[in-house]
């Protein structure tokens, strides 16, 4: 009964794994391909590259804002006033105005510093992405290597079981062994066959994971690489450098928020073309006015609170990363 069950299981595994194997990619060794090149290509096809490209756009936008002649967009106004509906004394007034915001003290410098910090943060994020992808590639290739070694081991065991079965059958036919010995040998052969099929399937699965990650149908010539001479993790580690850059950018945001607690002052220029009541002639004039918004908690309190929260979150994340790396180093 057990022999029949093992035989049925082995046949089922064979058809199942053969069917799956037909859908997987057969990888070949490329003696010109290096592990470094595999990592580079994997980084380029990472879905997180979309975030990096968006980050470049954000840095560019911050540079535009910092290098702008004005801190925000100007505004144009136009108006007409007459007494046609009212006293009807021939009053008429046309006015066109231009509102120009002006920089607050230190605002332009703070925005420039923020743009520079955003570029540094993006560079650190890109470096951390490279480290993360490199780790995934290493896991993929070494998992594949281990799966290949396991398949070779199971193949050797299966061949040994077949040789043993042939010898036992020969000795049974010669009357030296009982039929039960043959059945035990057949049972061992089927177990070895099932293990071999499973090991080969794991190779296919590992190849598929490698292909999904790298997009390559080729394996590097060797999985080995020189060992880094560093023995201790310091602040230059990409994971820590990224979180440290987030702290810096949060500090820059707080500095800018402290300056922008009130709105930008505005210089308002206007040209007026008017005719007074009962007058027949128009008078043209030019006016200048200054608008200075006042500081109020209704505006500044949420801005500073958000800035402080961002700093606290960045520092907390950095501390967590430090502790995690220290625990595994």
Residue locations for each model-derived region?
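Cleavable N-terminal export/targeting peptides
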Residues: 1-31
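Bacterial Sec-pathway N-terminal export signals of envelope proteins
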Residues: 20-75, 102, 176-179, 211-255, ...
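Amphipathic alpha-helical coiled-coil segments and their boundaries
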Residues: 38, 45, 52, 101, ...
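Small/polar-residue-enriched beta-strand and adjacent coil segments characteristic
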Residues: 72-129, 246-248, 253, 260-322
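Histidine kinase transmitter module recognition
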Residues: 66, 129, 136, 174, ...
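Periplasmic alpha-helical coiled-coil/stalk elements that build and connect Gram-negative outer-membrane
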Residues: 130-242, 248-250
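Hydrophobic faces of stable alpha-helices that mediate helix-helix packing
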Residues: 32, 56, 116-119, 123, ...
């Amino acid at each position: 009964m057990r022999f029949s069950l093992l035989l049925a299981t082995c046949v089922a595994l064979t058809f199942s794994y053969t069917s799956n194997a037909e859908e997987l990619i057969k990888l070949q060794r490329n003696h010109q391909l290096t592990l470094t090149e595999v990592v580079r290509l994997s980084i380029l096809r990472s879905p997180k590259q979309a975030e990096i490209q968006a980050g470049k756009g954000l840095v560019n936008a911050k540079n535009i804002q910092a290098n702008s002649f004005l801190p925000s967009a100007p505004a144009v106004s136009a108006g007409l006033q007459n007494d046609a509906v009212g006293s009807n004394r021939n009053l008429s007034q046309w006015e066109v105005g231009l509102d120009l915001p002006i920089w607050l003290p230190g605002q332009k410098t703070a925005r420039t510093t923020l743009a520079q910090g955003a570029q540094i943060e993006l560079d650190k994020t890109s470096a951390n992405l490279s480290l993360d992808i490199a780790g995934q590639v290493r896991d993929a290739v070494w998992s594949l290597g281990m799966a290949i070694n396991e398949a070779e081991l199971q193949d050797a065991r299966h061949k040994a079981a077949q040789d043993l079965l042939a010898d036992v059958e020969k000795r049974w036919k010669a009357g030296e062994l009982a039929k039960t010995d043959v059945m035990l040998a057949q049972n061992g052969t089927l177990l070895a066959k099932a293990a071999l099929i499973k090991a080969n399937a794991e190779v296919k699965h590992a190849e598929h994971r490698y292909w999904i990650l790298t997009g390559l149908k080729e394996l590097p010539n060797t999985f080995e690489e020189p060992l880094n001479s560093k023995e201790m993790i310091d602040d230059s580690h990409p994971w820590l450098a990224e979180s440290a850059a987030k702290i810096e950018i949060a500090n820059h945001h707080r500095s800018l928020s402290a300056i922008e607690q009130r709105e930008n002052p505005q210089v308002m220029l206007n040209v007026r073309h008017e005719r007074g009541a009962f007058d027949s002639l128009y008078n043209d004039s030019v006016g200048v006015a200054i608008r200075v918004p006042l500081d109020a908690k209704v505006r500044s309190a949420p801005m500073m609170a958000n800035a402080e929260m961002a700093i606290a979150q960045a520092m907390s994340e950095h501390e967590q990363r430090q502790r995690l790396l220290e625990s595994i180093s």
